[in-house]
Amino acid sequence: MKTKFNVEVYITEKVDLVNPFVKNRLKYALFPKDNAVTSSIIQGWQYEPYMFDFLKKNCIETYGKDIVDVGANNGNFAVEFSHLVGDAGKVHSFEPQRIIYYQLCGNVFMNGLDNVYCYNVAIGDRDGVAFIDKPDYLSLENVNFGNVSLKGEFDYNKTDIVDMKTLDEYDFNDVVFIKIDVQGYEPNVLIGAKETIKKHRPYLFVEFEEHLLIENNSSEDLLKKQIEDLGYIVKRFQEGIPYQTESGKCLDCVCIPIEKESLNHIVP
């Protein structure tokens, strides 16, 4: 399977709210006021590089595998993951925000990626629908469109309705790792992924954000125990500690299947 096709981008009129951007031969349509992932792309550095460092330093084979990206945002990881899995692998990118999903699809298309599959779906612990914050995408203020959470009730002006599914509903092939960054909804994603995790035993890259977990009736401690109960060892990137209770920080962790711990992984 050839995973890359040729795309030429023609800009006929400047749009103030969405800018085309090319860096290192990668193409992106970006909200210039998005101050998180977008700013890293514009400045030319890789967002959360320790995920890729972990895979590289531990010589983890990704070619021909599946990568699952839950909370795909604008596709910056999807583009990078596409090159990791190569012609024989697939990247499955899930993004519940309708407008950001369109952006994700556009960036996948502009880079000519045939091995990335995009889904406008909220991943959780059940099959149904979910309500999600609808930020002001026309705002000229600095914002973080990745900092959007699922809500308990519908508000016509402030929320969108999106389908919710579990990861276990999908038929993946040889999953090497799953990235989960869903603003406090990580425990629910894991509940709906038990069979997928049991079958593939992938590495997990999980975001711990205490105040968002508390809003979802969980915590860093509870999330860590939930992952350990699945047969994983939780290690925190960068500082070498698993978690920091009531930290108020956003903590990114790598979760290693306990049966692979003897490999003495290097954690960046």
Regions inferred by a protein language model and the residue ranges of each:
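Core alpha/beta nucleotide-donor-binding catalytic domains of modification enzymes
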Residues: C105-Y137
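Conserved acidic-Pro-Pro-aromatic motif
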Residues: D16-L17, G89-S93, D168-P268
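Short "lid" loop at the C-terminus of a central beta-strand within the Rossmann-like core
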Residues: Q97-I100, A122-D125, E210-L212
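Short, hinge-like loop/turn segments at secondary-structure boundaries
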Residues: F109-N111, D133-S139, E220-K225, C253
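Hydrophobic pocket-lining residues within nucleotide cofactor-binding pockets
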Residues: A72, I123-D125, V182, F208
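Short, charged, solvent-exposed linker or helix-capping segments at domain edges/interfaces
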Residues: S40-I41, A130, L140-V148, S262-P268
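S-adenosyl-L-methionine
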Residues: M1-D114, F154-N157, I233-I241, T245-P268
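Short internal loop-to-helix segment that lines adenine-nucleotide cofactor pockets
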Residues: G44-V68, F131-K134, F145-H200, L212-N217
